[in-house]
Amino acid sequence: MNTGGRLIAGSHNRNEFVLINADESARIRSVEELSGQTCQICGDEIELSVDGESFVACNECAFPVCRPCYEYERREGNQSCPQCKTRYKRIKGSPRVEGDEEDDGIDDLDFEFDYSRSGLESETFSRRNSEFDLASAPPGSQIPLLTYGEEDVEISSDSHALIVSPSPGHIHRVHQPHFPDPAAHPRPMVPQKDLAVYGYGSVAWKDRMEEWKRKQNEKYQVVKHDGDSSLGDGDDADIPMMDEGRQPLSRKVPIKSSKINPYRMLIVLRLVILGLFFHYRILHPVNDAYALWLISVICEIWFAVSWVLDQFPKWYPIERETYLDRLSLRYEKEGKPSELAGVDVFVSTVDPMKEPPLITANTVLSILAVDYPVDRVACYVSDDGAAMLTFEALSETAEFARKWVPFCKKYTIEPRAPEWYFCHKMDYLKNKVHPAFVRERRAMKRDYEEFKVKINALVATAQKVPEEGWTMQDGTPWPGNNVRDHPGMIQVFLGNNGVRDVENNELPRLVYVSREKRPGFDHHKKAGAMNSLIRVSGVLSNAPYLLNVDCDHYINNSKALREAMCFMMDPQSGKKICYVQFPQRFDGIDKSDRYSNRNVVFFDINMKGLDGLQGPIYVGTGCVFRRQALYGFDAPKKKKTKRMTCNCWPKWCLFCCGLRKNRKSKTTDKKKKNREASKQIHALENIEEGTKGTNDAAKSPEAAQLKLEKKFGQSPVFVASAGMENGGLARNASPASLLREAIQVISCGYEDKTEWGKEIGWIYGSVTEDILTGFKMHSHGWRSVYCTPKIPAFKGSAPINLSDRLHQVLRWALGSVEIFLSRHCPIWYGYGGGLKWLERLSYINSVVYPWTSIPLLVYCSLPAICLLTGKFIVPEISNYASILFMALFGSIAVTGILEMQWGKVGIDDWWRNEQFWVIGGVSAHLFALFQGLLKVLAGVETNFTVTSKAADDGEFSELYIFKWTSLLIPPTTLLIINVIGVIVGISDAISNGYDSWGPLFGRLFFAFWVILHLYPFLKGLLGKQDRMPTIILVWSILLASILTLLWVRVNPFVAKGGPILEICGLDCL
């Protein structure tokens, strides 16, 4: 091999050799070798450099790239060579970009800003090596006009895309908008901008921009098939990306190392401190209060385990960014139908009296007006209460949508829920330039007020239900007069029936669904309603993606669906994503957020941590699903590339490693075959239990159809739609036949002997079906994504007061207890699947946390007991113990501060979350634990009422009202007991004196810790507006008094030995 006296270098990671020059004058390749080559990105010929030599972009591999592509890649791309991935260095005559070294080309600063002296005019303005002297050109001379790097002979001299100044000193150019008058004189808009930016597609004419992109796509296809084989196939991640349309639609943004590394180190340090703390606590018991010490140590160990389960899933938090412009470039091409995937939106409601129809109507209107192709959106409203009020309100909503939807899209209104748009105090004229906007906004506001009056009239009419029930306009009875016994109902209000808006544009589909209900059937509450919507939508529209929102969660960001599609439709990473979860944001909450309704710590810290693992858990609303994932299919397996071997190891070492690798691969293949065989056997057993000859049956089409029907149900239309990964319907299906099939799939007995609720759809078995559903999908190897756009995608209404908030938390905790006591418990379910171990820890924490209520209740009672008895849970504290306690409390505080820093959470939100953790733990979690045990073990059913979402006229009129509920008694009792203990402890110290104030300080600090966490109750006791109901106060004081007197009477922690006063009398003194 003739090396020409140069050094040869290579690597096992690159399939190439690099020739290193022996002296500075030598080049990697000569000018003769590179002359005449074409750019491997755009296909144009490579021009000469400033020095008159052939342009070489990469000094490592000399991959042929022209200067405009090189500068575009450095300015807009990843700034690296497409072949060897080496970062491009700045070449003489090219503009600087962020990341260039300070001394890089310092001798070229003049040429960087003055192109007239560098001889760069020809290659900047002409990609075909056409040379002309710009400085000497007369004002009236014909200058070749360029469109995105190519000459366009059809453009007249009066319609210049680039304006060149005749002065020899410098060159001006303009990013000119398209003027309708060709005689209009263009002028520079940004004279300081670098002229080179126009060499690679920065002219603002949209039609030419699209034409240029089309030509670039064609050139790219030629290069991809006929060019260098090292570029790989179309799915390879190493393919060079020429424009934004081929770049990823989203990217991960890890937390800065300056924030996350100290946080991780502190977690490890806190683990060490915890170990030393428990070592001290266990080896130093309190002899005169052994029971108190033992109980406290048990509680502390449980708290430590709970902290580990909560902490480690936050080890690798990340954030994400989306690129909506790239999504449009890739899937929305001008002159062609949109290629964005369809989305079926599910809205669920039950009781229109507690979930006002006006709130549901606003949610539906925000969905119909979403910024997405109308033929790709369908809204399905599930009315599980079969209320005629909901039906009529939805009919009025469909009529008003004909005016509201075109108004929103014409003026880009945000948010697109009219109630919140008109009530928000904001500058609605900002960025509005249309002269008719103010007039049309006033008219639209008047129309919406009339719409509200109609809805209010319907609500008032529905208050008085006729004895014989409601009837339709033609006199036929309303099918849903009996809520528990009625047929299935489907009504298509908008969509394919020809109803258009006032501007004659098509509207998204709007479908009313009320599934069949009969006595004796288990309808599985919300999970059953959602599964009915899956089947109905699969028959009528069959979009590949589903969005689930509650009736009070409207779309606050009209581009929310596009945000989700940036993840779902990403060709590189989208195939393995089962759902995109958005955070919950709320309206109608005061600034202090006294009851932690926003739940900021969970959504901005915990969920970001889970996103760095296998993805966030499903929280029940604001989630875009992949339909195939809900159907119980496994995630696509990623093919592992073979590892490269290195020649630097001895042969005997490679031989040993190869033997171990072969053994491991054989074992893995054997296990894989066994698993596949067991799956096939299990599938055949499910198809035909107790029969023989299953091998023959499995080969027949009838057996395959039987298997699908056993899984999805007895609907051939729906079974056929389930096999379409990209959605769509049969071409020969008529709307009438599809409607009949949709009625069938929402019948009561459709799910019998199928896998609905077990392996398909929303999973049954818990009132928190959201946790189970997400857990099932993660167990199948799918991953989820947490999307937090700058403008919140969805907003909803939070519980009005503390009582409703506690009932909401009670429902969540009861669902966790049900999952813990079921076969789907993450402690023992799903091993051998695709669930990662840190993700499993998060699911274990989500079902274990209600059990913390028992040690928390006991631990919050200990301060009062210590103050009443004069005992304490720790012995006399030494210097070592003092340092240990201070280190523990300090690590807890600093961990919280660092979490707030990288999670961007305020101190107020963090403290409210800590308060409500104690309040909910000693009230709702405790009740949920006992109700869950009764429900699972004894079969005692618990009925939950829907949380009221109606608001009064006052902004926060009911926010702090304490309504009667037994959930308020335990925390109030704890508060009173600790206040009594503080009073008794201080009084005893003043009366009798203390040898050491240290023990008293420790007990008082312990008691005040509990009182501060229960402060909202204390404010309810003392405040006027927030006063607690008298019955709760009476019961709490009575219970606290009984417990205090009983404790003083029993006094179990006082030694029983010693003199007895009745025997020795006064001589004992």
From Swiss-Prot:
InterPro entries reported in the protein's UniProt record: Cellulose_synth (IPR005150), CES_Znf_RING (IPR027934), Nucleotide-diphossugar_trans (IPR029044), Znf_RING (IPR001841), Znf_RING/FYVE/PHD (IPR013083)
Q: Which GO terms describe its molecular function?
A: cellulose synthase (UDP-forming) activity; zinc ion binding
Q: Report residues binding UDP-alpha-D-glucose.
A: 348, 354-355, 384, 525
- State where Mn(2+) binds: 526, 550
EC number of this enzyme = 2.4.1.12
Name the positions where Zn(2+) 1 binds: 39, 42, 66, 69
Function in brief = Catalytic subunit of cellulose synthase terminal complexes ('rosettes'), required for beta-1,4-glucan microfibril crystallization, a major mechanism of the cell wall formation.
Q: What else is known?
A: Partially redundant with CESA6.
What's the protein name?
Answer: Cellulose synthase A catalytic subunit 5 [UDP-forming]
Q: What is the organism of origin for this protein?
A: Arabidopsis thaliana
